[in-house]
């Protein structure tokens, strides 16, 4: 993509309404635009990042055996009355009526609807286990939306739901998603710590939040420092082997880690002080096991091996892709702008032509650009007729991991400069050597 043909509305000044760095940088870098309180449009640069996050989520869900569906954003209130949550959920749920005066709602979550889908088709234990998920926009009427897309009213959510015959099988499904989430966040470039958490309005017996540590986090968290040394399960993990899954989850839950709501001062005191870490954290995922909380009142039952009917055991699993984008920025930025993790960078490389009217610079930039495109990469070429300082500032702000700088002096020597956005290290290479180096990244 050539920047002269791209829609990238950069803001030079920090927006007054931005309270945290991710909100500020997402507005300044032309990633989002606020339409009204807590509701945002995603602009081209942001949409590319969001799509990459969703692609990784889908790949890991598929690897773990989950099946993607798509449910409507508007739901019937009758389903929520069946589960007993219609009156309990509170003012966060946007209640509406259609022209026939039927009670509807803009879905804040989908336990009831997916349970209705399940009970309409599944009758036998032979069709279990089953895990269905979607990536869909949701709405919760937050009393005080703030921090940009970190706490917005409309947000993108991957919500998944598992159905099993008994507790043992349901726990395996829970473990499967636990591990899939560890892999998902690791691939996105985030270090997460799974923490025991309150089940909240979803309900249930078991719940883990996946937290990244950040100074601007809205949650107080307490964990063992040794979590920071742990690495996510490999791609080779066998999601069909219950013993393997159980062992991995045990490793990741053996150390103390909890949110403020579940914090136990006595257990905390037993941890060596050198391993104690109290910090702020951002929730990027949440998983729940809630047994028959929804299947029982809604009649989601299957015929067991003994010919008797049993309500299915369920779990739900959420990741907020839109929130994840902001969390990635909170975790990786500097005074000049964003530093994207490579897996979710909007463009693979940024090419800066510091002298657009110089024929030599133009030719070398074109060679680099076409060479990278032909090699399967997605580069961004800043070919605008702007001063070099403005081009450097733009490229630093939008955070592409690798910059390729072409100027008259280096071009005269048939050389270009490669700069690592995170470390600031630079390397001077010929165009051919640069293409070889970049293609190997």
Swiss-Prot record:
The keyword Zinc-finger does not apply. Keywords: Aminoacyl-tRNA synthetase, ATP-binding, Cytoplasm, Ligase, Nucleotide-binding, Protein biosynthesis. Catalyzes the attachment of proline to tRNA(Pro) in a two-step reaction: proline is first activated by ATP to form Pro-AMP and then transferred to the acceptor end of tRNA(Pro). Belongs to the class-II aminoacyl-tRNA synthetase family. ProS type 2 subfamily. It catalyses: tRNA(Pro) + L-proline + ATP = L-prolyl-tRNA(Pro) + AMP + diphosphate. It comes from Bartonella bacilliformis (strain ATCC 35685 / KC583 / Herrer 020/F12,63). This is Proline--tRNA ligase. GO terms for cellular component: cytosol. GO terms for molecular function: ATP binding; proline-tRNA ligase activity. Disulfide bonds: none annotated. The keyword Ion transport does not apply. HAMAP family: Pro_tRNA_synth_type2 (MF_01570). CDD domains: ProRS_anticodon_short, ProRS_core_prok. SUPFAM superfamilies: Class II aaRS ABD-related, Class II aaRS and biotin synthetases. GO terms for biological process: prolyl-tRNA aminoacylation. It is found in: Cytoplasm. Its EC number is 6.1.1.15. PROSITE patterns: AA_TRNA_LIGASE_II. It is an enzyme of class 6 (ligase). It comes from the Bacteria. Homodimer. Gene3D superfamilies: Anticodon-binding domain, Bira Bifunctional Protein, Domain 2. PANTHER family: MITOCHONDRIAL RIBOSOME PROTEIN L39/PROLYL-TRNA LIGASE FAMILY MEMBER, PROLINE--TRNA LIGASE.
């Amino acid at each position: 993509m050539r920047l002269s043909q791209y829609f990238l509305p950069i803001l030079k000044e920090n927006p007054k309404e931005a309270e945290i760095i991710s909100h500020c940088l997402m507005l300044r870098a032309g990633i989002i635009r606020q339409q009204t309180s807590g509701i945002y449009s995603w602009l081209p640069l942001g949409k590319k990042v969001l799509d990459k996050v969703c692609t990784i989520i889908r790949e890991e869900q598929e690897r773990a055996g989950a099946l993607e569906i798509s449910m409507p954003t508007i739901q019937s209130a009758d389903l929520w009355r069946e589960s007993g949550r219609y009156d309990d959920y509170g003012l966060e749920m946007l209640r509406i009526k259609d022209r026939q005066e039927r009670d509807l709602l803009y879905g804040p979550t989908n336990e009831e609807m997916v349970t209705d889908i399940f009970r309409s088709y599944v009758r036998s234990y032979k069709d279990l286990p089953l895990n269905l998920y979607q990536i869909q926009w949701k709405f919760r009427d937050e009393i005080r939306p703030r921090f940009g897309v970190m706490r917005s009213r409309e947000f993108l959510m991957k919500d998944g739901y598992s159905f099993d015959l008994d507790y043992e099988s349901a726990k395996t499904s829970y473990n499967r998603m636990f591990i899939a989430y560890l892999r998902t966040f690791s691939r996105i470039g985030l270090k997460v710590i799974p923490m025991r958490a309150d089940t909240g309005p979803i309900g249930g017996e078991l719940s883990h939040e996946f937290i990244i540590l950040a100074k601007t986090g809205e949650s107080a968290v307490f964990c063992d420092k040794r979590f920071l040394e742990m690495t996510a399960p490999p791609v080779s993990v066998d999601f069909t082997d219950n013993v393997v899954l159980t062992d991995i989850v045990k490793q990741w839950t053996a150390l103390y880690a909890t949110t403020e709501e579940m914090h136990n001062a006595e257990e905390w005191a037993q941890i060596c002080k050198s391993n104690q870490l109290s910090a702020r954290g951002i929730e990027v995922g949440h998983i729940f096991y809630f047994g028959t909380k929804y299947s029982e009142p809604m009649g989601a039952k299957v015929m067991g091996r003994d010919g008797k009917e049993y309500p299915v055991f369920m779990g739900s699993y959420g990741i907020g892709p839109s929130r994840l984008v902001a969390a990635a920025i909170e975790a990786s930025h500097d005074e000049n702008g964003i530093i994207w993790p490579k897996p979710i960078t909007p463009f693979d490389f940024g090419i800066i032509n510091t002298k657009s009217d110089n024929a030599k610079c133009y030719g070398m930039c074109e060679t680099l650009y076409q060479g990278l495109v032909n090699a399967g990469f997605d580069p961004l070429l800043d070919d605008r007729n702007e001063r070099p300082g403005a081009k450097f500032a733009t490229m630093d702000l939008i955070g592409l991991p690798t910059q390729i700088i072409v100027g008259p002096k280096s071009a005269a020597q048939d050389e270009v400069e490669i700069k690592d956005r995170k470390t600031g290290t630079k390397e001077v290479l010929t165009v051919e050597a640069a293409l070889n180096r970049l293609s190997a990244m």
